[in-house]
Amino acid sequence: MVFSKDLPSPATMFSTYASLAGYIMMIKPMIHTIIPRPIQNFVFSYIKSFVGSPQAYLSSKISPDASKLRMTRDPNNKNVNLHLSQGEVVSDVYKGIELKWRYLEGRNKKTTVVGEETEEAIVNWQCFELSFDKKHKDLVVKSYIAYVERKAKVIKEERRIIKMHSYSSYTLRWQSVKFEHPSTFHTMAMTPKLKSSVMEDLDRFIKRKDYYKRVGKAWKRSYFLYGPPGTGKSSLVAAMANYLKFDIYDLQLANVQGDAQLRSLLLATNNSSILLVEDIDCSVDLPTRLQPATTTLGAPKGSTPLTLSGLLNCIDGLWSSCGDERIVIFTTNNKEVLDPALLRPGCMDMHIYLGHCSFEGFKILASNYLGMPHDSDDPHRLYPDIKRLIDG
């Protein structure tokens, strides 16, 4: 065997290979440790969505003639979900094309080397096999798959469980519970004009993803609810969440130890959600740009305190673009004491005043509590007197 003088010797090559192999064996287990868990969860959830979309779509296509099905139900969900079993086939038709979906699942043995120890684990996998005539490949790839994604999104939204998230200063992360507030726009004691205005604004926001992208703005909307105590501000937030099927993130500014932690909390929220800051006038004393900032009690030494500038940057600045389909809601009983920077149109898109009950609102309450129709042609005999007393 002849070696070129430009090539390293066999001993050098073997030494390099041994070092490289040892380096790879050392790095491999470190990947699971170095990569943050949220990134791993994001990657896994992204991969899982490729299976979840066909699964949701096909759940509405399952034939009664299927020989074997799987039935599941989440403990927090009232809906029963039907899924295909191993090898079951579902037929579909799209623009005259016949397609067949087949569900497959299995398990593989995975070996992981950690230091000098070898760990073995069983990894379950599942997938859907889609078959069709190859002459329709372009239509299926460019049109049908997107159609399945859209239909699956609608089905998932109908079955979605709304959650209420709160920040835990003990675990330093968001914790959630199932949100079961019964408030809806139908039961809200609001004037019909205001109610329609809010609902139309929400509908317009949801449908304008392309518009926000075209004008170069973050896909978000902010609402400022103000009025006397007990006039339905929290109930309106619940009605908005139930109407849109959005999760709620209840942010207590008093528990936030600085601008950096506020940014981290907002980055940990999901899309299609509501960020709620209740009673912002009394939750924390936010120093303005002209006031010296003081460190929050209990904050780590050297940390940046929570400031009005930091809050505005997260709501309407560069950090507000980190996410899509977000809604921000501030509530207060005393609008006059807030800094004007929080109330400007660029920060709060819609101001909603919730005052004391009007006569129209009273009729809705009478319908809710007493079962009296509020739009009847034959109103109650006391309604004229009640209207006179409420209107003053």
From Swiss-Prot:
Predominant subcellular localization, coarse grouping: membrane
BP-aspect Gene Ontology terms: response to stress
Subcellular location(s) of the protein: Membrane
TM helices/strands, residue ranges: 13-35
Source domain of life: Eukaryota
Alphabetical keyword list: ATP-binding, Hydrolase, Magnesium, Membrane, Nucleotide-binding, Transmembrane, Transmembrane helix
GO molecular function terms attached to this record: ATP binding; ATP hydrolysis activity
Reaction catalysis annotation: ATP + H2O = ADP + phosphate + H(+)
Catalytic class of the enzyme: hydrolase
Positions bound to ATP: G227, P228, P229, G230, T231, G232, K233, S234
EC number(s) stated in the UniProt entry for this protein: 3.6.1.-
Cofactor: Mg(2+)
Gene Ontology cellular component terms for the protein in this record: membrane
Protein's membrane topology: Single-pass membrane protein
CDD domains in UniProt: RecA-like_BCS1
UniProt-listed SUPFAM superfamilies: P-loop containing nucleoside triphosphate hydrolases (SSF52540)
The family this protein is said to belong to: Belongs to the AAA ATPase family. BCS1 subfamily.
Protein name: AAA-ATPase At5g17750
